[in-house]
């Protein structure tokens, strides 16, 4: 039996020697065939077990593929948005493990030991040493091993790789290919002293590495300015030239997009996009969700009771106004608009007011309909709108209140009697005072006297016939008659004259 050169093989089969007798050769051949049969059975058993393990893994992978395909098929016809969260950056449930060897290495060979134990002890005892031929003695040859065939250069490189550089890879430290990415740097990730490799470098290389490191740190501290700052005055060269569409904020056309999109394949229909403005409000009041509600103003409503028939036929009837609040009630029936200067209403008679009983307050919310065609039907009517302030009426009121220099009253020329003979017309330049028109006439006479330069108004008018004609055209002021009309009639005549 010779030692096999394949030291890493777990199986060894004995070879039949050529210097054995016939009986020993038969026994040795039987043992070798038995060992070969066991070896073949063991090899195929290991192969079958490995195939079974691989088949189970493939079946698990197929099951995972089927489950994933079923999920995908379920999502194909769905119209709902689905969020998928990965468990990790690279989702994987198990850690990579080294693949088990199909034929593991064995330290001892139990088959060969069993074969050696089964050999008969008296195999070679039947033949004496003298019977053996000297030619059958074992012949030894000197054979060089693999280690002795290495050249000195290869051995030196191996030693250099073990000692210099980053060193050899640890036996149990590298478990996957991504772990080798740590060797892209100049630092040995598995060593305790990370700066040990620097001491083994030549001094020039050390200075070069130091200068490069300082340059890198300097570049990291201050990066070059961007193109927009370095060349802000120059325009960027575009392949299309200056013909670019740059709409303003309000010049871009509005795209008419429907609110509900049609049935599109592969598009979810329950997606909701919230604008950024709504997510981050700017108004400080939106930060407080529950704001206290302000109390309502306590305004009472106003009830006006009129006769239903009088309101329908527009016949004035007794009206009793009861003002309780400051704000008018909602409009339900609009009365006829009064004239712009509303005259003061006559005082209602006390007998009618006392005879009409005061009905209970009628609800004014909502539309109010007459309950019955009785003479006194409560209707909810608003207060008449206040008269608009007219600047002309204000001016007339101011003029009436002034009344000229001596407090005279203005009269309409139509109200003056036609048969009254005015003595002031015969008196040329006679000073007539008492009302505003007379004062204006006197002022005009003084102005004419100042223009003509004469001290006597009679001489000024006598020497100028044109002025005499103008003075004749201007009507003389009308003198008010005492006790003719009351003050109310005077005010009405004044309004008629100026209107």
Swiss-Prot record:
KO phenotype (gene knockout): Lethal. Larvae die at the transition from third larval instar to prepupal stage.
Domain WH2: residue ranges: 391-413
InterPro entries: WASH1, WASH1_WAHD
A single GO BP: endocytic recycling
Source species, domain of life: Eukaryota
Protein keywords: Actin-binding, Differentiation, Oogenesis, Phosphoprotein, Protein transport, Transport
UniProt-annotated stretches for the region Disordered: 317-433, 448-499
Signal peptide: none
This protein's record includes keyword Protein transport: yes
Pfam families per the UniProt record, alphabetical: WASH_WAHD (PF11945)
Biased composition (Acidic residues): 490-499
Sequence positions bearing Phosphoserine: 491
GO MF, one annotated term: gamma-tubulin binding
Ranges of biased composition (kind: Pro residues): 333-363
PANTHER family: CXYORF1 (PTHR23331), WASH COMPLEX SUBUNIT 1 (PTHR23331:SF1)
Function: Acts as a nucleation-promoting factor by activating the Arp2/3 complex to induce actin polymerization. Participates in both linear- and branched-actin networks. Functions in linear-filament (bundled F-actin) by acting downstream of Rho1 and regulating actin and microtubule organization during oogenesis. Nucleates actin in an Arp2/3-dependent manner and exhibits F-actin and microtubule bundling and cross-linking activity in the egg chamber.
Family: Belongs to the WASH1 family.
Subunit structure: Component of the WASH complex. Interacts with spir and capu. Interacts (via N-terminus) with Rho1 (via N-terminus).
Protein name (Swiss-Prot/TrEMBL): WASH complex subunit 1
Organism: Drosophila melanogaster (Fruit fly)
Name of the gene: wash
